[in-house]
Amino acid sequence: MKNIKRVSWVASNNVFLEYDIIKKHKLSFDKALNKFGIGEDQLFFLKLNNYGYKIYWCDAVKVTEDTHKHRANLNWLIKRSFRLGVLGHYIDMNIHGRLTGFIINYLKCIYYFSKAFSYIFLFFNIKFQVQILNYFSRFYGRLVGPFVFKKIDFFRK
């Protein structure tokens, strides 16, 4: 099949795998991420990748998902981006260990801040306004993630 690419993680809505792999490594979805409504699959498949299993993605396979109207607005996008920043910190620490994960988290903070700042001169273009807000939200989520992860339980909406 064309367009097959090796990746380190995938979403759980379009995956086939052998159950023996799950049993062998006693893998499960991290319940600490339930309150976010996202991220459980990313962490699960990153662990699978770290065990040496190959994960492939193909853009020729079509997967559809219902559109939720309450998610089709800028406010929801900003909150989701913040959540992704916060849980990104948790995933980095879970995969790489406490110190390395902490360092990676703050390097990603710098990355998201610099991406947002690089678009600041294009602020009058609506497309870039959304991108700037998205990057700043992700930056802020990463920045405060180590301090607020356990306290967040209201962002799942």
Predicted regions and their residues:
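Residues that recognize and position ribonucleotide moieties
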Residues: 8, 15, 56
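Active-site phosphate/pyrophosphate-handling residues
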Residues: 20, 43, 62
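Short, flexible, basic/aromatic active-site loop/helix in glycosyltransferases
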Residues: 1-8
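Acidic donor-binding loop at a coil-to-helix junction in glycosyltransferase catalytic cores
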Residues: 34-46
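Short, hydrophobic alpha-helical packing/hinge segments within bilobed ligand-binding/sensory domains
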Residues: 44-45, 77, 88
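Non-catalytic, C-terminal membrane-associated alpha-helical segments of glycosyltransferases
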Residues: 79-86, 96-157
